[in-house]
A protein has these predicted regions:
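P-loop NTP-binding module
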Residues: 1-128
């Protein structure tokens, strides 16, 4: 499936890679993994693409692999207005979270919040 990689390499157009679900949701997948993904994400073409998308859309979400796995999230954090860390309850270790914060801060990314997922919902313990 074609996506961001093909768009940045000028093999496909925006219309060819964009999946228009409704008037409020458009998704562009990563596409085929290039030989140098971090370089491609750090490129001027990626910066220009994000700038164009900011003119077209109100919100842009860049879903990346975990910070501990590859540098993609760290690279893209410098191009984003903010970073949301996603942490799984009962699974993600505190040291991994602290290391992730450090990695984002090293490149001057802006952490705007944390999403805690995988939390068990207990109906009887619900309160404000």
């Amino acid at each position: 499936m074609s996506g961001t990689a093909e768009l940045l390499l000028r093999k496909e157009s925006f219309e060819d890679v964009a999946n228009f679900y409704n008037e409020n949701l458009t998704i562009i997948t990563a596409g085929k993994i290039p030989p140098n993904p971090s370089e491609m994400l750090a490129s001027r073409a990626m910066t220009a693409f994000i700038k164009e998308m900011k003119e077209e859309f109100k919100y842009i979400i860049l879903d990346t692999p975990p910070l501990q796995a590859v540098t993609d999230a760290q690279v893209l954090s410098t191009k984003a207005d903010g970073v949301l860390l996603v942490v799984r309850a009962g699974s993600t270790k505190k040291d991994a979270v602290l290391n992730s914060v450090d990695l984002i801060e090293k490149v001057h990314g802006k952490i705007i919040g944390t999403v805690l997922n995988g939390v068990e919902n207990k109906k009887n313990n619900y309160y404000y």
